[in-house]
Amino acid sequence: MIVLALDVYDEDRALKIAEETKDYVAMIKVNWPLIIGSGLDIIRKLKDRTGLKIIADLKLADIPNTNKLIARKVYEAGADYIIVHPFVGRDSVEAVNELGEIILVVEMSHPGALEFINPLTDKFIELANDVEPFGVIAPGTRPERVKYIRERLKEGVKILTPGIGAQGGKAKEAIEAGADYVIVGRSIYNAPNPREAAREIYDEIRGE
């Protein structure tokens, strides 16, 4: 299942791409570029236009009170899930989880993640198994790590994998390794025909 990462600034462009691709997309992920460029209202507009759930990829990483202050406004704006960094500690994670559903970053897809994040993977998995978030982030660029995380993660916690497409990850490989969702951005929103690009990835996952 595909999560469309709309890492663009322009509201009109984001809404157009979302409408064009909604038949092949399970959820939409909004990150800082779109929120800064278009405001928090873009969350509700995307939901109203597509009927899809929205992930707010804020990667919250602050003290509990600040995390809670941010999260409250984002959930009120219509976000279904907020992505949170676990390295700031259980109390900061739980401050967000008390307000709504969260997704924890266990590993990231870029090379730099190997330096500081990956050494803490097992601790992040342990925290995820305790707080039972909706899901965790694992790297679609490294299917073997997706498999490692899946084998240790509590049943029912979803795995979402960024890094598909532009970063080199393959959608089908990530799903076969244990991912529930593949997060795809540039390969769809920068494509000449975003709908066709989304359909091709959808068909790849389905083996068609």
Swiss-Prot record:
EC number(s) reported in the record: 4.1.1.23
Matching SMART domains: OMPdecase
Active-site annotation: K59
Pathway membership, UniProt: Pyrimidine metabolism; UMP biosynthesis via de novo pathway; UMP from orotate: step 2/2
GO molecular function: orotidine-5'-phosphate decarboxylase activity
Reactions accelerated catalytically: orotidine 5'-phosphate + H(+) = UMP + CO2
Binding site for substrate: 7, 29, 57-66, 109, 162-172, 185-186
Major enzyme class: lyase
One Gene Ontology cellular component annotation held by this UniProt entry: cytosol
Lyase listed as a keyword: yes
Keywords, ordered alphabetically: Decarboxylase, Lyase, Pyrimidine biosynthesis
GO BP annotations listed: 'de novo' pyrimidine nucleobase biosynthetic process; 'de novo' UMP biosynthetic process
Protein family (similarity comment): Belongs to the OMP decarboxylase family. Type 1 subfamily.
Subunit and interaction comment: Homodimer.
Function: Catalyzes the decarboxylation of orotidine 5'-monophosphate (OMP) to uridine 5'-monophosphate (UMP).
Protein name: Orotidine 5'-phosphate decarboxylase
Gene: pyrF
